[in-house]
Amino acid sequence: CPHFIELGDSRRFLNIEVSRPMVRIKNLVHTSWQTASTSLESRVVISAREVFDVFCEYGETTCHPAENGSYVICIRDTCNVHIDNYYGLHGWGFQGHHGIKGLYGNRNTFNRVDFHSFGYDVFFKDLTVKGRQINLQGGNEWSIEK
């Protein structure tokens, strides 16, 4: 299991930041027991921004539930993202923010799926949403199947 150190005292703590295209993250297990008094709402486990071809496979993230947000995976302005076999009960689960084109997910469990601004061509198969909701904004093709 990899270990990551959080640096800084800002509102946003990232464990993994994807800043180049064609990245594969496999077999990640992340356990975090922060509480609301330690900025739980500002945490993101995996973040990708302005890249393409991102593959997240076989991962699990767990922590104390949070009402006010914390995302397992946060994707911004990115194309061709694949998320397969993820179990994430870390605040709100998955967030697509400011634009995703081509999101593909298979066999995932999230506490919440949340799109801010827009998502285009989004396909989830065998998706389980536990606890919260799905917030969709965007267009073109959407397909969400159990």
Segments (PLM) and residue ranges:
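Extracellular/periplasmic carbohydrate-active domains that bind, remodel
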Residues: C1-K146
